[in-house]
């Protein structure tokens, strides 16, 4: 336990006050130091810099700023001080990206410039993916870099699902569920149909790019969507992924 003198109420109150004061001052000093580094970088780039140092939950205050209407784009790192080997994305980054109403740039490699490799855009036919396409084409034109569009679908999931279900269904239940017919329907209609739909989205994206005077490479990917897209990014050594949220 604590030494006897620290067990006295007055001493404990004093120590709490000292601790709170030191922590508050220390955090302010750390925040100012972060700002100083950013301010110096902006000064070199001849860009204006404004400091925001709100008190509260870090992710909540960042989200609050994105909702203020004062900003168009948020940039933040994928990992922070709590990163450990094997981490892919930090909790602050994940919480902020989920809640941010404005476009968000997530930096995963601070030593690599956007444009040092192709720009990849994810397409699913939605309004937001169309917006992502236009953004990717604009950045690609400005930087003189290739833009690739990908669409991904998972034709393998139902095989896993049906195999799992087959292991627990009785013959009678299988007849009620029309198990074999359902399986055939997925193979012949749903899988092929989804592939055709996503391929058409890619072709429309390619025409949109052509109308804007841009070249666009397209590719239909199969597999777990996040994994298929991530593997493609590695394959082409992409410098930026643009997707709608």
Describe each model-derived feature in a short phrase.
Residues 91-93, 132:
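Conserved sugar-transfer catalytic core signal across GT-A, GT-B, and GT-C glycosyltransferases
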Residues 75-78, 104-109:
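Short beta-strand elements of ligand-binding domains
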Residues 78-79, 151, 244-245:
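Short secondary-structure boundary segments
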Residues 89-90, 244:
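Glycine-centered tight-turn and secondary-structure capping sites
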């Amino acid at each position: 336990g604590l030494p006897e003198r620290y067990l006295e109420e007055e001493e404990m109150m004093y120590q709490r006050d000292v601790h709170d004061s030191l922590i508050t001052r220390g955090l302010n000093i750390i925040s100012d130091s972060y700002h100083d580094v950013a301010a110096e970088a902006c000064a070199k780039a001849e860009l204006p810099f404004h400091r925001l140092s709100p008190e509260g939950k870090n992710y909540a205050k960042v989200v609050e700023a994105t909702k203020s209407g004062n900003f168009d784009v948020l940039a933040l790192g994928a990992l922070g001080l709590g990163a450990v080997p094997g981490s892919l994305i930090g909790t602050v980054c994940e919480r902020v990206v989920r809640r941010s109403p404005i476009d968000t740039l997530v930096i995963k490699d601070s030593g690599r410039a956007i444009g040092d490799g192709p720009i990849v855009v994810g397409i699913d036919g939605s309004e937001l993916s169309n917006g992502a396409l236009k953004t990717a084409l604009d950045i690609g034109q400005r930087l003189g870099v290739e833009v690739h569009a990908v669409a991904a679908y998972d034709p393998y999931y139902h095989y896993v699902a049906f195999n799992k279900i087959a292991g627990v269904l009785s013959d009678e239940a299988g007849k009620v569920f029309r198990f074999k017919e359902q399986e055939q329907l997925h193979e012949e209609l749903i899988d092929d149909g989804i592939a055709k739909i996503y391929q058409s989205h890619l072709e429309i994206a390619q025409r949109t790019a052509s109308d804007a005077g841009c070249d666009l490479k397209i590719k239909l990917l199969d597999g777990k969507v996040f994994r298929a897209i991530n593997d493609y990014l590695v394959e082409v050594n992409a410098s930026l992924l643009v997707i709608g949220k």
